[in-house]
UniProtKB/Swiss-Prot annotation:
Keywords: Acyltransferase, Flavonoid biosynthesis, Transferase. The primary product of this enzyme is 4,2',4',6'-tetrahydroxychalcone (also termed naringenin-chalcone or chalcone) which can under specific conditions spontaneously isomerize into naringenin. Belongs to the thiolase-like superfamily. Chalcone/stilbene synthases family. One of its GO terms (biological process) is polyketide biosynthetic process. This is Chalcone synthase 1. It holds the Pfam family Chal_sti_synt_C. It is an enzyme of class 2 (transferase). PANTHER family: CHALCONE SYNTHASE, HYDROXYMETHYLGLUTARYL-COA SYNTHASE. Pathway: Secondary metabolite biosynthesis; flavonoid biosynthesis.
Amino acid sequence: MAAVTVEAIRKAQRADGPAAVLAIGTATPANYVTQADYPDYYFRITKSEHMTELKEKFKRMCDKSMIRKRYMHLTEDILKENPNMCAYMAPSLDARQDIVVVEVPKLGKEAAVKAIKEWGQPKSKITHLIFCTTSGVDMPGCDYQLTKLLGLRPSVKRFMMYQQGCFAGGTVLRLAKDLAENNRGARVLVVCSEITAVTFRGPADTHLDSLVGQALFGDGAAAVIVGADPDESIERPLYQLVSAAQTILPDSDGAIDGHLREVGLTFHLLKDVPGLISKNIEKSLKEAFGPIGISDWNSIFWIAHPGGPAILDQVEAKLGLKEEKLRATRQVLSEYGNMSSACVLFILDEMRKNCAEEGRATTGEGLDWGVLFGFGPGLTVETVVLRSVPIKA
């Protein structure tokens, strides 16, 4: 018998077709806050009502945020039990960690259960797990906890991503694509779960960028199943993952920073994050879509991480995008706030649901090609090229 070559083994290991998103699930805590009422609540619960000028500033931030409501695990009762979390910079990491190490995997499980149900295959067919959170750290990690909570096989191959921030919804899809395409038959469960218990704190007029975070961030978890060569009798691809890239923007050092301290996760923001992103976004688009021969940015569908309304406004203006291009993105920002890594997966879910309800020809608003952008600390940008799937009538 002839010896098997390494090349033959490698060929057998690889999938034939591209990776695709096969199912999506999302989850939020039950508790939510409306943006209109939030300034009064926030300044009351943090015992900061004497800071009247700062409260007015915060009200203006909330008014301009384009957010209607946000979901939050932290209820008034939890905050009353943990007064140090309500202070501006009081030691509180233990209390925060105690919450997130339990709640982050739990919320992730809710989203994963929905994705697995839609996928339609037994969970024993999940070969890989990617878990991503910027909310706390622990060993063994959320990936291990979720494996136990879901009852996945102990041999599932796990990846744990901590402290990546808002670009990571793109990162997880890039990793899942590589795993699915290089491991024949692989089915990758991807989970992003974020809870603001690590960043919530009272206001200070010396740290206005922290206040921006208090006005924007919300809690949520999203899960997707990614695989290549779908079993068409059961699996229904939603979006193909065609290519994926990551880059650090020039002259952007320190634009967005987060530091884990005794006081929790602190958040620092340079004012011109929207300018840095909008100035460089066309370069990323040209690199991604040049090989496909696309240069009209209104001819593709858009999934952009909604870091805040200013980023979306400036990207729209810089590229001359029609208003409807960022509709799904703005919809998610309005109804959930900025959920860090989970946002782009929520937007994928929103878009495919809108397309089905409106009778569109494809999952990409009737278009074939689309882009998914993640923006976050670094400044780091993730660019994923998507191919939509026809919606069967």
